[in-house]
A protein has these predicted regions:
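Histidine-acidic metal/acid-base catalytic patches
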Residues: 1-105
Length: 105
């Protein structure tokens, strides 16, 4: 079905010790969207990108290498609900830095 596509929130595969890039391998051009967030020590707690230990920079590099050109969003969750502007700015700044390090911008 052309209307059914894949999406990956990168924390659950990380927590389950699965390869995030395996989603791209399995879904190919049906992999349509990513929720980019960080995590730490196998916990499903969502952290601002760059503030945990998920290898986001390496993932971004691989996404660039395979030609991923679809959508991605930064996910802010309840830990950051009281001051979303502050945390959104920090998340965007961190992502810009990670993207630059991965050679995307």
């Amino acid at each position: 079905n052309p209307y059914v596509v894949g999406m990956c929130d990168i924390v659950p595969p990380f927590v389950q010790h699965e390869s995030i890039m395996a989603y791209f391998d399995k879904l190919g051009n049906k992999m349509d969207h990513m929720h980019i967030i960080d995590g730490e020590n196998g916990s499903d707690t969502h952290l601002i990108p760059g503030e945990g230990n998920i290898p986001i920079k390496e993932m971004l590099y691989e996404m660039k290498r395979i030609g991923y050109d679809k959508t991605a969003t930064l996910e802010l969750v309840t830990n950051y609900i009281n001051e979303p502007r502050f945390y959104a700015k920090r998340a965007i700044d961190n992502m810009r830095e990670l993207m630059a390090e991965a050679g995307i911008v």
